[in-house]
Regions:
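Extended substrate-binding grooves/exosites of carbohydrate-active enzymes
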Residues: 1-213
Length: 213
């Protein structure tokens, strides 16, 4: 299965998923974690789009654009309300649009974990980078929704240890629906060291100044 984080992909990709039998979570182009994720603090009062009326039209427009373009692809089984935009009424209204327009597919949104005011935005419990024990705590507490680990095991180089502890949950808990790896691609650029030997360089290897994040 594939999550098209964090926006719809080019149409050819869905054709290939249809042909080869991949399940798809099609994700709307909504991403605003820069408005509320600050160093050492979370500021929900800065959240966009939340329930701000001036954003509702844009939120629904992006949902419509995705659904109308992609609705005939059988590989798509879930619509996603976007990525890391906290929560709020506008995203809930987006989820309701998906259900009214297409009641054959489920709706996903990870942000309900952070903002329970509109818990019905998502048809499944979803989190990013949860620890194994945190997932088990949820699954052992009479869950009313299946758990989808929508983003996890992000790694650079050889730092990706312990993945088996997550995959083992799939056989242990019927309500655990697996997860989506971020992001199965080399995060570096091939370059050469001073001896002419090639290596994959990551951030900080180019004499660049790291950002706050």
């Amino acid at each position: 299965a594939v999550r098209t984080s964090h926006y719809p992909n080019q149409s050819l990709w869905y054709d290939l998923c249809d042909e080869y039998g991949l399940y798809v979570i099609d994700e709307a182009n909504i991403e605003s974690h820069g408005t509320w994720q600050k160093i050492g603090e979370v500021r929900p009062d800065h959240v966009v789009p939340d329930g701000k009326s001036e954003w509702l039209g844009t939120v629904i427009d992006r949902a419509k654009s995705m659904v109308e373009r992609d609705k005939n692809h059988p590989s798509i089984i879930i619509w996603s309300c976007g990525n890391e935009s906290y929560g709020g009424e506008n995203l809930y209204k987006m989820s309701e649009y998906f259900r009214e327009r297409d009641n054959t597919r489920l709706v996903h949104y990870e942000g309900i974990f952070r903002d329970r005011r509109f818990n019905d935005t998502s048809d499944m419990e979803s989190r990013m980078y949860a620890k194994v024990y945190e997932i088990e705590e949820y699954l052992n507490n009479n869950p009313d929704k299946p758990f989808v680990h929508c983003e996890y095991t992000h790694a650079m180089g050889n730092s990706n240890g312990g993945m088996h502890k997550y995959t083992e949950l799939e056989n242990k808990y019927p309500m655990y629906q697996g997860g989506f790896i971020w992001d199965y691609i080399d995060q570096g650029i091939m370059t050469k060291d001073r001896y002419g030997k090639e290596y994959l360089a990551f951030g900080g290897d180019f004499g660049d100044r790291p950002t706050d994040y």
